[in-house]
Amino acid sequence: RNRNPGLGVRSLHEQGITGKGVNIGIVDNRLLTDHVEYKGRLKMYRDFNTWGEPASMHGSAVASIAVGSTVGVAPEANLYYVSQDPAKFGETEECTAPVLEGLTYLLDLNELLPEEDKLDVISISYGWTEKKGGEELTALVERAKEAGIFVVSSSIKENYGMDFSGTSRDPASNPDDRSA
């Protein structure tokens, strides 16, 4: 481990809190499936509508932050990843549809997984309020909650009542400084 993910994450790892036994689902852009940071943690990869598209830096960054071996918050967690067409992410119904498809796929898969492999968290780098498809996404988040899955998204305030908007620290400062 030669990189510090910051926010005191290393001290958690030193205490044995590494994500072992945790299963994380991600719906994002096409993934570099052989990336050294997370390829050993990738348990399932499903590619919807991205054939021929290049892999995305965003999806790889999200996977690395989640389960990366040197920068991950939970480097021993398992990763279940659904890839969607990056051109479809945005503000319209056609943008919401791939997120609905990906989240539905993960929730359906979760019902088939053995207890020890069931998802604990799903990350979606997408937010919604009154967009077309927003009601359906909110219903899927409720379905996830009923299954004991926490859904991290840009709509976390609307779905969980949490007002979270970042660390508000200087990115050039000590990555473990949480005083801001």
Where are these regions (language model features)?
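Residue-level marker for well-ordered alpha-helical positions
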Residues: G6, S60, E135-T138
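Substrate-binding/access-modulating region of protease and related hydrolase catalytic domains
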Residues: H13, G19, D85-R178
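Subtilisin-like serine protease catalytic core
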Residues: S11-I24, N29-K43, W51-P98, E115-L119, ...
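Intrinsic low-complexity, glycine/proline- and repeat-rich
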Residues: R1, R178-S179
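Short coil-to-helix leader/linker segments, especially the first N-terminal amphipathic alpha-helix
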Residues: R1-S11
